């Protein structure tokens, strides 16, 4: 019996949890903390690689199994994805380890009857080029998502976005805060044009990277979020406040509405600009979700604008590439300018932002 390495066992477990609705980055952070750095790095490579290339891997399962769209239990499919990813996409993993440990993972998941099938399929895997059946499989992206990007951005930019989602994200550090922060995310707070001493309301502030940027620019920040646990990550220099999504913003006393010089709405969104680091979004998101996000996002702007001082500036931002969450959300509001970053065209994640001025 072959022993399964900690990295592969944890990867197998995390991928099953992601399929059940978990988030890969959170699960990796929690489950690899006790591993040696080499094993933790391998687990991250396996989990994120299998998610990034999921549709290619599923096509390759059928290709090497000699069956179109074989019906497989989840545990068997995950073991095959892990095995094929190691055999075709990684260079320094011994083939015998990739095959033998994938077989043992299936046995350990009480799918012993499928062990022979997994072994037979993985032993056929080679690195010969295959003909992908369509662009969506080639780029490992849902067809509906690729098609809408092609319509909105054009085929070349859409391909660049999809290819960027297959790459490992580059780690950036914000020199003003010393925090790890994507280069695209760093571009949002400067749109607020903060001057020292200004008051800033940062809605949806966790994990606090943009809050830290505003503080570094000299602002006095009130940082808000719905989740107390996440709000704990926000810099202590900010006034921190937990919001109830069903209640109005709690900034009015004795009939007086509190106002801020600047408001940042870093809105919850689909996250399609962050697929390189959060590849499970590709397989989880549905077109109808965009309209659900849109309704919440417009409501956030409507609730926040009354708290902006006359002449103040509000910046609405998402890490989405979708019109429904961006241009369509800010339509009808007093927009001064918009800003966008597109993966493949620009470094880092994708973002949209719109600056609005309150003239009352």
Per-range role (PLM):
Residues 1-360:
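S-adenosylmethionine
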């Amino acid at each position: 019996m072959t022993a399964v390495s900690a990295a592969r066992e944890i990867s197998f477990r995390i991928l099953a949890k992601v399929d059940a609705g978990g988030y890969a980055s959170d699960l990796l952070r929690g489950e690899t903390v006790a591993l040696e750095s080499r094993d933790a790095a391998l687990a991250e490579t396996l989990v994120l690689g299998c998610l990034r290339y999921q549709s290619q891997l599923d096509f390759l399962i059928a290709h090497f199994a000699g069956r179109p769209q074989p019906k497989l239990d989840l545990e068997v499919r995950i073991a095959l994805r892990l095995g094929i990813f190691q055999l075709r996409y990684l260079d320094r993993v011994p083939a015998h380890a990739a095959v033998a440990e994938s077989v043992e993972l299936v046995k350990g998941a009480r799918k012993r009857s499928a062990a022979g099938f997994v072994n037979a399929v993985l032993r056929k895997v080679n690195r010969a080029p295959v003909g992908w059946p369509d662009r969506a499989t080639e780029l490992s992206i849902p067809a509906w998502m690729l098609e809408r990007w092609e319509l909105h951005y054009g085929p070349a930019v859409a391909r660049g976005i999809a290819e960027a989602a297959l790459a490992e994200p580059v780690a950036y550090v914000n020199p003003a805060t010393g925090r790890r922060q994507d280069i695209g995310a760093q571009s949002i707070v400067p749109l607020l044009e903060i001057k020292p001493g200004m008051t800033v309301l940062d809605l949806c502030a966790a994990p606090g990277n943009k809050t830290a940027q505003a503080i570094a620019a000299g602002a006095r920040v009130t940082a808000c979020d719905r989740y107390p646990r996440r709000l704990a990550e926000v810099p202590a220099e900010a006034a921190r406040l937990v919001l109830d999504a069903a209640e109005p913003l709690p900034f009015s006393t004795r009939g007086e509405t509190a106002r801020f010089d600047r408001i940042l709405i870093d809105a919850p969104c689909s996250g399609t600009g962050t697929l390189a680091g959060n590849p499970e979004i590709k397989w989880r998101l549905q077109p109808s979700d965009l309209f659900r996000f849109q309704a919440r996002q417009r409501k956030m702007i409507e609730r926040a604008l009354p708290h902006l001082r006359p002449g103040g500036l509000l910046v609405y931002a998402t890490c989405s590439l979708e019109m429904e969450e961006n241009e369509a959300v800010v339509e009808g509001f007093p927009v001064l300018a918009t800003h966008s970053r597109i993966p493949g065209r620009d470094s880092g994640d994708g973002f949209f932002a719109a600056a609005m001025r309150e003239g009352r």
